[in-house]
Structures are given as C-alpha cells and as structure tokens.
C-alpha cells in the first residue's frame, strides 16, 4: 500500500457521536491494560472491524488499546466540526496528534523542484491553510513531500529551488511553533520523486536551517531506498522530528517482514526519543484477526526493555 492509498482511504472515515462499540466493549482482552514505551500512532481504518466505521469510536478503541498518539494523512480535508471533535477527544485523553499532509502532493509532475512561481505560491498558500488546521488540532507536525523531479533541470538547481521554497514556508510556520517534516519516499513505490534519501533530506534541512523544517524518517521507505537503518538514523538524528513504521515487504505491521523493529525501537528509545511513531502501514490479515495481529505485533516489538 502506498502513500496515495493511505491518503485516499483516510478520507473515507466520517464523524459521529462517541459511544463504546458493542463489538469490543465486552472483550476483556481489549481493555486498556498495556502501557507502551513509545508513542505509536494508529490511523483511521486500522481497527474498523472491531471499532466500527465511526471515526470517534475508532479513536476510543485506539485509546483503549493503550495507544497515546494518532495520525491522519487526510485530516486537512475533514470537516471543521469533526476536526474539533477529534481535538477535544485527544486533549481530554492526553493523546498527541501526529502528522497530516499539509499540501497537494505532485506525484507525476514537478512543483517545488521546478522553481515555478505559481506552484511555489500554491504550496505556500496551502501551508498557511495548514497552520489553521494544526492550531485546531493542537498538532505540531505536518507532512511535506516536495513532489516529482524536474527532468529538464540539473539536480543542483532543483535542490536550490526546493530549499528556497522551504525557507519561505518556515517563515510561515516558525511564529506558530509548527514543524513541516520532509518525507523521503522510496523509488519502488514512488518512482521519479525528488526526495528519496535520508541524507538528501538532512542536507536540505541543514540548508533551510529552521526549527520548522525537519525530517520524517519513514523506516519502511528507507529500508527499501537505502537500508543501513540505524547508522543512517544516527547520522540524521538531530534533524529527525518524526518516524513512521511499516515492515518490508508488504508495508504491514512489524514482525511481518525483514525489519527488526524490536531492535530499532530499543535504539530509538535509548536515544531519548519521546516523539511519535506513525503506524503508516496496512494490516497483514483481513478482518478482526488482522486487527488483533496488529495489536499483538506492537506489544511484541515494544517489549524491548526486558
């Protein structure tokens, strides 16, 4: 499942009144009896077989499993009334809001890399809009993907175009203490994109030189793109503000692929990371069985202190 699928699927969840769904209310195994060592953030649609399709019921279910963060790529497109309900629930339950996608992503044509002034203006306008969404949700981070390569320009000029635009976006975000996190995406799922490697994101963040421009290190994407995960995380550490998770192959929950998430989480925890790790992946199995498998997997890989 790729990012476009996540963005599209997240838009299908609608709001409603909060109640405990009978599908899970009586299951003693699903009560809030586990405290995670890190802030893993599920998304809408991950537990809809057990929690139901109502977004507020899903949030309650997420909380009841012990998760204390939540992310939603499609939050910006949701009705303000629902955003306010979500914000109220998160605040009352001491949960953190994770990333949402801040702008239109150009998957098939260049925008930020091109230096086109109209596309730059569009991007900055959408960043301004996202400030209001972040305020409403008490969110700190928003995802930025610089879009497609401009194959008619040298990579050096493209990089400069991206840096100049991100500096302007940082000027918008800094007064509000908000952070755009740049997400490198892998070549296999998203061929032709400008930003692919952690070192490239690190270089850009250093050039922008703003507390409002940091890295979203997606462990799934970087396993495919470059591997060598922990050394690369170490090299980029002081510019990483957010992590996302997914095993490879398959982009499903930890323990279903080749990545040793227990060791990675132990390393991240030892480094003192207290931010969010977004669960931006699918479920390896369908229905209730698959949702229980996700919960079990996170309890397994989170058990790294013993």
What does each model-found stretch correspond to?
Residues 46-48, 74-76, 103-106, 148-150, ...:
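Active-site-proximal loop/turn and secondary-structure-junction residues that shape catalytic pockets
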Residues 56-75, 138:
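Catalytic domains of carbohydrate-active enzymes, especially glycoside hydrolases
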Residues 80-86, 155, 287-290:
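Metal-dependent catalytic neighborhoods of phosphoester/phosphodiester hydrolases
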Residues 2-63, 195-217, 221-306:
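Histidine-acidic metal/acid-base catalytic patches
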Residues 71-91, 146-150:
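Glycine-rich, proline-tolerant flexible connector loops at the mouths of alpha/beta enzymes
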Residues 10-19, 30-34, 93, 112-214:
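Active-site acidic/histidine proton-transfer and metal-coordination neighborhood
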């Amino acid at each position: 499942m790729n990012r476009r699928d996540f963005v599209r699927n997240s838009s299908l969840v609608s709001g409603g009144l909060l109640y405990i769904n009978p599908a899970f209310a009586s299951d003693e195994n699903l009560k809030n009896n586990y405290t995670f060592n890190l802030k893993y953030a599920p998304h809408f649609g991950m537990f809809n077989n057990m929690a139901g399709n109502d977004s507020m019921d899903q949030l309650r279910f997420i909380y009841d499993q012990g998760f204390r963060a939540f992310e939603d790529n499609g939050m910006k497109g949701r009705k303000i009334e629902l955003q306010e309900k979500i914000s109220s629930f998160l605040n009352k339950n001491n949960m953190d809001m994770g990333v949402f996608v801040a702008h239109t992503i150009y998957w098939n044509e260049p925008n930020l890399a091109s230096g086109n002034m109209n596309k730059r203006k569009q991007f900055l306008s959408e960043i301004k809009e996202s400030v209001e969404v972040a305020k409403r949700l008490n969110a700190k981070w928003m995802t930025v993907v610089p879009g497609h390569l401009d194959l008619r320009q040298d990579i050096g000029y493209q990089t400069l175009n991206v840096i100049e635009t991100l500096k302007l976006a940082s000027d918008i975000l800094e007064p509000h203490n908000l952070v755009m996190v740049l997400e490198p995406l892998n070549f296999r799922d998203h061929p032709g994109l400008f930003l692919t490697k952690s070192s490239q994101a690190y270089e850009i963040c250093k050039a922008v030189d703003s507390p409002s421009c940091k890295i979203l290190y997606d462990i799934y994407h970087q396993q495919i793109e470059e591997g060598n995960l922990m050394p690369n995380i170490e090299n980029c550490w002081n510019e990483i503000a957010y992590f996302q998770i997914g095993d490879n192959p398959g982009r499903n929950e930890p323990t279903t692929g080749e990545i040793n998430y227990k060791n990675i989480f132990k390393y991240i925890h030892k480094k003192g990371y207290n931010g969010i790790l977004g669960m931006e992946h699918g479920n390896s199995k369908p229905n209730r069985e698959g949702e229980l498998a996700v919960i079990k997997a996170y309890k397994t890989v989170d058990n790294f202190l013993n």
